[in-house]
Amino acid sequence: MAAAIFAKVSPRARVFALVTLAALAASGVVVIGVFATRSDVPSPKLRPGRPPLALDLGVRTDAGARALERAQTLYNRGRPRQAGEIFARQPSLEGQVGAALAAWPDRSLARLQALAAGHPRSALVALHLGLALYWSHRDAEAAAAWRIAAAAQPDTPYAVRASDFLHPRFAPGLPVFSPSFSTPLRIRVLPPERQVAVLAHAAATGGAHAKILYGAALQHLGRPRSAEAQFAAAARLAPDDPDARAAAAVGLFDKDDPSRAFSRLGPLIRTFPHAQTVRFHLGLLLLWMAQVKQARTELRLARAQNPATPLGKQASAYLAVLRSVGTR
């Protein structure tokens, strides 16, 4: 569970994994773990270890969410039996998925298949069914389950994660829009659940910048479709605002069809030739696709426009990490 929606994180820490993956992928190196190597050769053996568990509880702080977080932490630390004991006491769908994987491989796949039959439109279930199928060397069925997860509930973090496995050459997750203006301090100091509520109210009653801030928060929460709607509304309200127009373009990014975002973002270079946000986010999207050479060019241009701004500093951080992983 995130400590805060807009928590202060070192730019280098935030971008290192993304840039490393992009740089290595551009060099032809497979870097996204086991999911980058597809094989449909039947095998009686399971893959080593156990499938990952990817419960996302957003900003929930209720007792059930805290229990699920504890269980997931135990699972991730290699203590599935203790995790399973906690999951077994949680009647939620998250608890049932966790309990099935904690018992791996003892009937885990069958239990997840039963959950999928009972909840055919649950991205949570389809994602983890795909992971169990993949660990069982049933790769084509795993990909089919991930496609269901991505399509059934596209406005969820589980759909975003499923798309990661379907597109292993892309950086994980989706690019998040970084406004050139700051979130007010009065919002940043609030607990995460209050941040979201305040941002939602401001977006409903305020102007383009309020909608952009809420859209960025929704992106952080794994709700890309809702974020896209907020960004589009901001662009309609303020068509001459480069932040609003760039956000609307970034919100369209889809690993199945990246051209939707690029076709909107690229022309903004001519519309707003001095807007740092356009160059920066063009570089970000290129980096997400492991187009390192082109990304570096755009990030350098963004930094040159003003290295002292938050976006200029982020561009510098990306470029520094690119240098540290051996790209020029």
Regions found by a protein language model. Give the residues of each.
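Alpha-helical adaptor scaffolds
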Residues: 88, 92-118, 182-189, 207-274
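Residue-level recognition of tetratricopeptide repeat
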Residues: 72, 97-101, 131, 216, ...
